UniProtKB/Swiss-Prot annotation:
Cellular compartments per GO CC: cytoplasm
Assigned EC number: 3.2.1.52
Active-site residues annotated for this sequence: 192, 263
Site, Important for catalytic activity: residue positions: 190
This protein's UniProt keywords: Cell cycle, Cell division, Cell shape, Cell wall biogenesis/degradation, Cytoplasm, Glycosidase, Hydrolase, Peptidoglycan synthesis
Protein name per the record: Beta-hexosaminidase
One of the GO BP terms on file: peptidoglycan biosynthetic process
Annotated substrate binding sites: 74, 82, 149, 179-180
MF annotations from Gene Ontology: beta-N-acetylhexosaminidase activity
Coiled coil: none
Length: 353
């Protein structure tokens, strides 16, 4: 009698993205990643010591399931760049590209494409599938949490530069994720610690802040993350929990058919929806495809124990479309690529001023 090798079940990506505590997977984390409700893992600076360790971690995460989980990170450039040492390129804050646009629009677009390429190529060489970038918020000069993460105050400039950045990401096989729909730039409060309120009417928001989402669409921006901001003249709930915003405006009115990620459900801006189960149910009910639960493994486990949801086939297919379509070169091969070398030199010029 021949012995049969035990194989992992083929689980489709679930609607919950979780994180991990350190630089290797614990037994509890391996168990959590095998939960059918899990569809992805978000990494933070605490998960990185060097490239070798990061590659080992991403390999372990991908091997946890027969159909690999989506591995994501907030890696925009400037102050939001989780991996900074051991060869990772220092990328400029996106506001620097906006300043360059004011002097030379074509040079700014070229540099944005090169920035996207370097960002994605380095992450993919280490096994990361997606960066939650670019920021599409308009720079009104009032939001400290957004600040120089925003390209520009003009929606048309934001659209052009984010399109160029997305092209660079795509050249390295990575999808783009625009955030924070419909716009976080007009409010001063930080949704990590407060519940921001934007008092403007819908027409004004659609004309200005949400315009890049309408102009870009899901072919250029395959994923979107709504803001934990309340727009009381539109809906009493934050955008990420609002069926009006996600299903009626983003999907139906703007015709968007990409992945919609909730922002982190443990943020203060999400507290208005209730406990962790209520927050997840509200986000998924509004039309989000995947919800993020960060920095609270206890809440992640609570949600995975309590959430009862049938993940729609359309959501599963959208998430699968975010996975890279071709294999990435390893780090050493990438370093010897002349195109990458040139793109990296351009970043160093703008970072150093």
């Amino acid at each position: 009698m021949s012995s049969k090798k035990k194989t992992k079940p083929v689980l489709p990506p679930g609607p919950v993205m979780v994180d991990v505590a350190g630089t290797t997977l614990t037994k509890d984390e391996k168990r959590r990643l095998r939960n059918p409700l899990v569809g992805g893992v978000i990494l933070f600076a605490r998960n990185f010591t060097d490239r070798r360790q990061l590659c080992a971690l991403t390999r372990a995460i991908h091997k946890a399931r027969k159909e690999p989980l989506l591995i994501a990170v907030d890696h925009e450039g400037g102050r939001v760049q989780r991996f900074r040492d051991d060869g990772f390129t220092a990328l400029p804050p996106m506001q620097e590209l906006g300043k360059l646009w004011d002097r030379d629009p074509l040079a700014a677009m070229r540099l944005a494409t090169e920035a996207g390429y370097v960002l994605a190529a380095e992450l993919r060489a280490c096994g990361v599938d997606l960066s939650f970038t670019p920021v599409l918020d308009l720079d009104y000069g009032v939001s400290k949490v957004i600040g120089n993460r925003a390209f520009h105050h003009d929606a048309r400039v934001v659209t052009m530069l984010s399109r160029a950045l997305a092209q660079g990401l795509a050249l390295a096989g990575m999808a783009a994720c625009g955030k924070h729909f419909p716009g976080h730039g007009f409010v001063g409060a930080d949704s990590h610690h407060e519940i921001p309120v934007d008092p403007r009417p819908l027409a004004r928001i659609l004309k200005d802040d949400a315009a890049p989402y309408a102009w870009l669409g899901d072919l250029v921006m395959p994923a979107v993350m709504p803001a934990h901001v309340i727009y009381p003249k539109v809906d009493a709930q934050p955008a990420g929990f609002s069926r009006r915003w996600v299903s009626e405006i983003l999907r139906e009115r703007l015709g968007y058919d990409g992945v919609v990620f909730s922002d982190d459900l443990t943020m203060e801006g999400a507290s208005v929806a209730g406990d962790i189960l209520a927050r997840a149910e509200a986000a998924l009910g509004a039309g989000c495809d995947m919800v993020l639960v960060c920095n609270r493994p206890d809440l992640a486990d609570e949600l995975l124990d309590r959430l009862q949801v049938q993940h729609p086939a359309a959501s599963v297919e959208r998430i699968r479309r975010l996975m890279p379509r071709f294999a990435a070169p390893d780090w050493d091969t990438l370093q010897n690529d002349s195109r990458y070398q040139h793109a990296r030199r351009l970043q160093s010029q703008i970072v150093s001023g």
